[in-house]
């Protein structure tokens, strides 16, 4: 069942209220992509309005002077990545709970581009799978410029900002075949790569806390500071494996509290300073 126009409008208004006003002095801004009257655009979110920009979000964007009401647009994913790299076993608390060794290097997979999905739109029950589907609230790193083999010391210069991610997973598929773990299939159903609603710039990620709310109840609450490979190190190590493009997203992995969703569930990933990524599982 598609969300009603009234419900979507309500979510858009709520989206605008949960973000702090952009602060030029601190450099904090909340970038958003949208569709308005059939045209796609991007801008900076300020309360319940969007200050529109033109050009390239990642390279000297220019303010257009146009101001749009958030309730009048359709929210898109905040960028269009060429890839989403997603981490496994990147938090100490979860590694300890699962009795997993601390990995010597990042363990990761890629989510299919067709899975990318925005705030406010329903996550779909897969037609070809009827098992358990779980939420995974995560921090996302958004790359701001093309890079390869970046040092950890210089990694901050290629990070544009941070976003919220729900790394939705068909959990029973992961190890269904004993000869081949199905990470790609389990993670890449249409609508399973949920991220947004904004990219926040000017934040110190190590001060952030990630919460996941399922049907009004908090299920995850964990600090980014518990990360085994923090953002700068991740970007450095991953960029030595493959070239990262502007707009690429790194999902930093999740921690304790992952759980299943049932049809009709409302799930939100909340990171103070970034915002709330909210979707319904249908």
What is the predicted function of each stretch?
Residues 148-162:
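N-terminal accessory regions of nucleic-acid-interacting proteins
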Residues 102-119, 135, 268-272:
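Structural signature of FAD isoalloxazine-binding scaffolds in flavoprotein oxidoreductases
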Residues 71-74, 94, 124-127, 171-282:
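Catalytic-pocket segment enriched in acidic/His residues
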